[in-house]
């Protein structure tokens, strides 16, 4: 049965407009993005099929163009639309983070870091550079690959802190495994960067680790 033949209260688009996007399932949200189904499948049926094929919404969003485009009902045009939507979301949250005080609204920072880092297939280490009022100046991804105590160079973090005229920084990196628990290398790296930045009077406020759930704050856990 076509979605057009469903009762209005059950159609994903109408439900989104009436109840908000948070009320929809992953399949319903994806169905709105797809807009149409394929012969024998409604957009919701197709969305469920795709989520089953990829394993989760996150894995679908992280898929490269080749893996994405070869699936039923998808293609280069849909891939381009999805990439554009994700980039708009990143830029929206980047602008929000620059307009709000990080320490007074840590959830804005968490939300921003989830969008920026959660879908990266490899580890990425970055910094949120803050001014003296702890307003976000900018975000920079500084290192990519295996993040350990030797891969991240304190001198580069110091250099970028000076270039951005930062008074404080929030460190962050992702764990592609999804487990946000800090490793011993993560803790050692944090200490090294704290010591290096102390020499130029830049304070490290926190180190967030982004996994599948809410980003973990090392400061809140008492590890800084």
Swiss-Prot record:
Keywords: Hydrolase, Metal-binding, Metalloprotease, Protease, Zinc
Residues engaged in binding Zn(2+): 173, 175, 186
Domain MPN: 102-224
CDD domains: MPN_DUF2466 (cd08071)
One Gene Ontology biological process: proteolysis
A Gene Ontology molecular function term of the record: metal ion binding
Keyword Zinc appears in the UniProt entry: yes
Pfam families in UniProt: RadC, UPF0758_N
Sequence motif JAMM motif, residues: 173-186
UniProt superkingdom: Bacteria
Family: Belongs to the UPF0758 family.
Protein's name in the database: UPF0758 protein Pfl01_5539
Source organism of this protein record: Pseudomonas fluorescens (strain Pf0-1)
Origin organism lineage: Bacteria, Pseudomonadati, Pseudomonadota, Gammaproteobacteria, Pseudomonadales
């Amino acid at each position: 049965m076509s979605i057009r033949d469903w009762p209005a209260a059950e159609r994903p688009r109408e439900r989104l407009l009436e109840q908000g996007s948070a009320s929809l399932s992953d399949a319903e949200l994806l169905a709105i993005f797809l807009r149409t189904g394929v012969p024998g499948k409604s957009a919701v049926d197709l969305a469920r099929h795709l989520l089953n094929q990829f394993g989760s919404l996150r894995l679908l969003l992280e898929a490269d163009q080749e893996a994405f485009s070869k699936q039923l009902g998808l293609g280069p045009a849909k891939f381009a639309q999805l990439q554009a939507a994700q980039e708009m979301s990143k830029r929206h949250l980047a602008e929000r983070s620059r307009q709000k005080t990080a320490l007074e609204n840590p959830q804005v920072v968490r939300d921003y870091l989830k969008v920026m880092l959660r879908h990266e297939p490899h580890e990425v280490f970055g910094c949120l550079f803050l001014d003296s009022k702890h307003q976000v100046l900018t975000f920079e991804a500084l290192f990519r690959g295996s993040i350990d105590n030797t891969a991240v160079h304190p001198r580069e973090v110091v250099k970028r802190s000076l270039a951005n005229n930062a008074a404080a920084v929030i460190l962050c990196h992702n764990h592609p495994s999804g487990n946000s628990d800090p490793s011993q290398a993560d803790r050692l790296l944090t200490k090294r960067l704290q010591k290096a930045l102390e020499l130029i009077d830049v304070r490290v406020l926190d180190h967030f680790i982004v996994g599948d759930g809410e980003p973990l704050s090392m400061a809140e856990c008492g590890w800084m």
